Amino acid sequence: MGISACDQRVAESTPPAPAPKAVEQPVAESASPTPPPAQAAEVAVTYRRPPFSWDTVPIYQMFGDGKRLLTDAELSIVAASSDFICLEKTHGLKKMRCTKLAAKREIERFKKIDPKMFCLFYFNSAYAFSFSKDTQVFGAEVVEEPFRSFLLSDPKTGEPKLRGIARMYDVLNPKFRTWWAATVGKGVRATGADGVFVDQMHGNVFSRRKQQKEVDAAQAEMMRMAKKAIGPEKILLLNGADSPELFEIGDAFMFEHPSARFITKEAIVKEWDDMKKIAAAGKISVWRIGVNKEPKAAKLVSEADLEKFSRERLSYYLAAFLIGAQPYSYFQYGWGWTLQDGALVEYPEFSKPLGAPKAEATRPDPAAWIFTREFEKASVRVDLAAGQGEIHWH
């Protein structure tokens, strides 16, 4: 996830997680676009899934405030907006001195409001953020063994290699993989979470392209170990899935859209197909949009301006989500990853009655990028070429 030591915004110096490979290789402009998929049938699974309903737009929330915990009022706002959440990596760090303790406290508070709230613990698979008692060793000026061997080294200096502010894990070290998976399992149990969100699934492969196959295999093995460590009823939400092997291991997948190139019209159509595949396997998808990645938003500074822009663009992105939404597809929306980046904004559209889709989406003109879909209580139209969407609530 593209998201300082104590303040979450500093971590935006780290690169974003890759989206699924199919998105990174969008269909050429001249190619015949893929038609939107039919709604997938629900299949039985062994793990617990978050509550899902078509009554209103299914919403996923993910946020953090590195300085503090939520106020009671903020807790109520978030709980009213979604029953599927994740606490971001620095949430509550300054207050609790350990993000694992902060996550435990917040999850307890959410579940007092609604025991069915589905809450995830955050852990990074590529960067050694020293925000919890389990990882604080990586923040030391000198990292002692065996933890030093868990980090990549700069070939010129021999010092731990950095990407932005973060030291980088060495996924090819089997002892690291064992430690990482065990730490994830311990974190899920200690916090009372319903699963884990795993960020940065690339394994720092950009540092050793010639070993991509080995890195991919090691990453997949580590996720398999993590799945075993958290237990069969807990979910493994992966930020991207770069291989069929990862798809088989993960229970849920995020489409992060870390930059504008991931939300082209071709990419969105391909993601609709991916969402169908995910649902057909009984898995979960999170379609996340940060409007701050749009070129126009780059000129906006204040939270008020960004909120206004997010409201202006909501009809398009929500329509695009609904065209491809399947059972257990969730929408995340805002302009960043902190608590102040949209998690507390109340969008009226999210509370309007939606109802289940009546049928698959249609494409009136095969040469155009306009798609429509009927829900029980809403009619949806999106023009991907124009970047415009309409939702008529019945």
Per-region residue spans from a language model:
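Bacterial signal peptide processing site
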Residues: 7-9
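Post-signal peptide N-terminal segment of mature Sec-exported envelope proteins
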Residues: 14-41
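Glycan-processing catalytic domains of CAZymes
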Residues: 36, 40-394
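Sec-dependent bacterial lipoprotein signal peptides
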Residues: 1-4
